Amino acid sequence: MTTTETQNPTARATAKHVRVTPMKARRVVDLVRGKRVEDALAILKFAPQAASEPVAKVVASAAANAENNLGLDPATLVISTAYVDEGATLKRFQPRAQGRAFRIRKRTSHITIEVESVPTAGGTRGRRKGGAK
């Protein structure tokens, strides 16, 4: 027995070599995974982490790609996939006492956000069937 899944249209945006460590960027990406794009941008606007700005840029870019390239309605977009990969590491030296040098690793990230259009049920979101009790 085979099942046929209807694939929702998806759009993707990627930011490469962003100067933020992948560990810190993953904390921010975990906040918005699975959320609606409007809600995710509101969350990222008030998030105190420095990585929230580049993540918000990628989310907005993915939404714009969905709207302009695929003609999707921005109100129906949900972040379906969001992940952060490790980019190239810039290696620097910090001079220390007595002629020593310590290595400083300036890490970069590749942030990928994928949004898909999920049709909303006709206005029944969050409502009860019965009246007030």
UniProtKB/Swiss-Prot annotation:
InterPro entries: Ribosomal_uL22, Ribosomal_uL22_bac/chlpt-type, Ribosomal_uL22_bac/org-type, Ribosomal_uL22_CS, Ribosomal_uL22_sf. One of its GO terms (molecular function) is structural constituent of ribosome. One of its GO terms (biological process) is translation. The keyword RNA-binding applies. Keywords: Ribonucleoprotein, Ribosomal protein, RNA-binding, rRNA-binding. GO terms for cellular component: cytosolic large ribosomal subunit. Belongs to the universal ribosomal protein uL22 family. This protein binds specifically to 23S rRNA; its binding is stimulated by other ribosomal proteins, e.g. L4, L17, and L20. It is important during the early stages of 50S assembly. It makes multiple contacts with different domains of the 23S rRNA in the assembled 50S subunit and ribosome. Part of the 50S ribosomal subunit. This is Large ribosomal subunit protein uL22. It comes from Nocardia farcinica (strain IFM 10152).
